[in-house]
């Protein structure tokens, strides 16, 4: 009772008589108005009486006063005596505790005074016996206590109710009979309850025992639930609520003995009582065993045991005894599982589930570990049954397959059971929740598994329909989320626990295939990586699966694919993720498993194939795996194996490709190109489109035909049966819109590989990644072009300007993607036009085709303008640019040979079929029909292509006049053509390489205005170093193919005069004088004749050799690899000249030796090429057979000119080309090595006659010109006599200080002899011979064959001069050439945009030139050739830009003075350098080999150059001087011509070599004055040309020297 506030104030007691008594009465009257016992007023009333009594005990108020007022108050309440007795009881206890006797006395007096108010009986109940004794109400308190004990014992401990059945068997028998009677009639629980009450009263039965008997009968009669529940509800209203729960708990405890087993009937009764809330679950739960902590411990123990099993299974077993031990352990574990202990909580749970009390069942499961309850089969089956009942109506409506009856499930009669689901929304109420508690143990009920999957499938169909409203869409999305959760937590784990149920797997795939692959793969990821770690059973299953997989994979071979495949299939039905993960790990280690594994996967289900795709992607994306090998230069073998496996498995089996393709796209977005290997393999295997650089020429030719020819002859492998697989790949790309994105990503990634990944990775790897990216783009684009319909392709590929400008696609890739679209467009337009007028003539068809081309290509011509700056279109027209990029080899030529080859193969095949006696007739007939059909297809395709090519050629014929504009020089036009068209496309693919070569030929054949074929070929061949160096491995292969095709054309023209005259003779592409635009090449004198063309071809071969040797000598990996690849590709047509081939052979041999241990891949390439080169050696020819060194008379006069200004001298074979080479060596030793290897290279040009270079028309040159040329010829002869030794002369390589490099291995004796010869003055006899030579020259000029010089004695004198003076002369001459031709650009190489002058040349270029001056065995002749070119070129400049020439005598005097001074300087410097030579000879004595004089002589004889001594051995040693002099005296006139020409050039070269940078200003000025005098006749000829090309030629000749080379060749000394 709460503490009451003070009710009676002390003032009332003090003034009791006056006012206090009245106030107290008034208070009590108010408090007595509420008669209840629970109100606060009742407590206040008690407090008021207590305080009044307490004042009496304290002595503040007399007891009489108090008794009087209490008497008055008694009238207010009837229960006044009881209240007052309670107050006295409290005061009795308080006063007993006090030691003050007075207070006790006052209390006794008060009670005595109030005895008339409270009865004695009430006081005896409330007060203490001792107090009662003091009041006199009892005699003795002791006797009272004894009597009270006796009464209580009689009342409470003496049995009055019968508890045991045997004590009152009649009563209990009647009770049982009452409860066990037939209850089907009108008997109600109320009637039975009245009878029970009567029996209890009559037979004194214990009510608790009666309740127990009722429960026992209820257990035995479960069918009368309603009756007994009603009876118990009525009965319990008379008992305490806890009684029923305690009785039930006592019953459960009875069965908790060690071997006790609780009956299911008891569980059921308890469950029913719980369902109807007659007992509380928490009250009953404490009576059940085992305890919760025991359950948790058991769960943990199961997990530990599962992990131990995993550990044991993964251990390496070496002996059979251990296997036996393992089997025994398995048996023991099975025995343990067979004897589960009695778990009353689970028994009650099962009962609750059976009656449908889901709420209480859920409460019990919540107190246990996850899935612990469901892990017991009975509980799992009970949950499954409840779910069966709940989903029955919905399943009947949407899940039952058509035609199936099914077995209906009866609903529970219990109204409190969960409501059944009528629609998908109802599933959210209870069903999904039930599945979550069931977990992986749905495996116990496959039927329910199938039902749920079918319901899910129906839901997905409804979800994917477009008719649903937005509100319904939100609800269905929630259901979808729940369905995915159920799939993750229940369906997939349950499948893992099922025993190889393929039907369930297929059923599940029926639902899974409606999910997008993102959902599927997320589910597979959860299944593989998390599910197996969450349940002890699944942990064991995972270990067992891996163990079994190991067993199968160890025994898998090609021979036992079928039985092993069946085992793999069986294992995969339940646990595909674990199995495939292990199989893929094995494939990554052992690539020889790929084929047997692929073959063994044919027994998988559809779901398993999809899981396999996911596992492959996960394996590819494994972040722990390195994608590169340890050397960081090659892609890891595991990735290559996976890629190969991907291609094979996706082709063979119907697996969804969307995920894999999206993965590759995502990797490309992230800038990672490694995984393109996957796409490459998939496209190759599925579509049969093979990308390889190892294609034969036959295959390449077949690839230029139609689709049928490509399939038959264009690939290495068998490309049949790809129709279905390529269709699947196409569908996957189109359905997920990945076709164009993948193309664009690959095109962009090509540059990304270089600029984003290039710095981090090894150059070799970057090249491989670039090639892989490019090849995959080509392959993928080819697949789209051949498989997509016209509509699909056009719909997806944007226009060319959008591709390039918006998507930043490189131009070559953009045109590659757009090309099929143009072809489709043109073809469809053409078909439309044909249909409009049927039966028209061929001419009309061509016209229609051209019309359709114009309609399609006109927008393209406009679009391409934005791709380049406007300046570009001054050189080439957009139409030409678009035409080049839009055509293919299919459009240009028909591969008749390929068609014929494939048709012949089919005929042979048909014959073999006829001859095969073992083949059944039906099969024979089928095969023959197939071959015949294929043959007809090929012939029809060939015919179709022929018609198409004819139409295309007609179109090109009409367009060609508008292709190239006359706004700029030919050189600029060719530059843009090569830069924007040829070079980007020739390295795009092997077919494009062939296309580029054939297109150049076609443009030539079409006689395209303003196109110089000669210039184009020269630019291609002149300097390939930079192009080769910048290529990747595959690009080098394609570039090699391009060069091979170009060389093939050139070789065809070179090999036969008739062919040359027919295909080039009258063509504007071979003009040597570039006239106005309208010129048609009709003037024969302006054409390059056959012999001079052969000289040009030799020059190109020399250029190729020089570039090749340079690349081989750099030591750079990419240079060496690429040039070897290029050389291998062009081997059929190069080298053709013996000495060039020998030079290459020596250099390649050296590479083989150097790289054997260092770089094995280069060694293999070099060895391969070396072997092939040796096999080609018998087909090589000497230089004099390759081109005629004696030029024809007519063309000796014919001039070659590049405009009114005349071109400067071309030194493309001599010094200018050398200044172009970047062959800088780091040490003197490396320079000497370069000498040995490149000697043969310069020999190529040594025997090449040089053409005269005049500025007049065909044969009518001015007299001044002739005289000038005559003077030059004499000078050459003199200088050659003085400076060329009788044996093979050598131009020394300049060192860094500008001095000559000494001959390393030349004996001292030779050097001394040489010095004495240099000091020998001219004899009288030699002077006489010189005069004779002048007369002979005059006669020759009169007969219109200028520049043919005779042998003279002065030549012998000049031969004695050292080669150093030739270098000086060449250096001075080249400088004069620059000064004399300032108004025109000095000719240079293809690659360099700057003028190639010796004066303006940077130090680096000078070093290059110095190294190149002495690299060849035939260097002397090379130097001569270069100087002749320089001399003649400068002569042309003189004709155009200088006053009339001086007299011949003055000119000769000037030459003599210059040469005398040069000789004096050379003698002085030679003394200084002699010491250096001797020292260097020792350092480099091992680098050069000596060649005996006999061998030197033999080589000279083979090349027809004995008189000139052009072939120089590798050794610096010269042949005996005397022998060579004698031979020279007996030489023929033609030999003399060559020799004088070469000696002059050699002399000039020696002057450059010896003089170097230290040449005095005085010498320079003198020679410059001489050059100005020589060029006196040039300006007179300017008038002859109607158009001005001076400025244009300046630009042109900065980067090109071909025309000048032609001029040099056409005028042979």
From Swiss-Prot:
The keyword Nucleus applies. It is found in: Nucleus; Nucleus speckle; Cytoplasm. Keywords: Coiled coil, Cytoplasm, mRNA processing, mRNA splicing, mRNA transport, Nucleus, Phosphoprotein, RNA-binding, Transport. Residues 1218-1234, 1264-1284, 1293-1342, 1352-1382, 1448-1503, 1523-1584 have a biased composition (Basic and acidic residues). The keyword RNA-binding applies. GO terms for cellular component: cytoplasm; nuclear speck; nucleus; THO complex part of transcription export complex. Residues 293-339, 896-965, 1464-1491 form a coiled coil. Belongs to the THOC2 family. This is THO complex subunit 2. It comes from Dasypus novemcinctus (Nine-banded armadillo). The lineage of its organism: Eukaryota, Metazoa, Chordata, Craniata, Vertebrata.
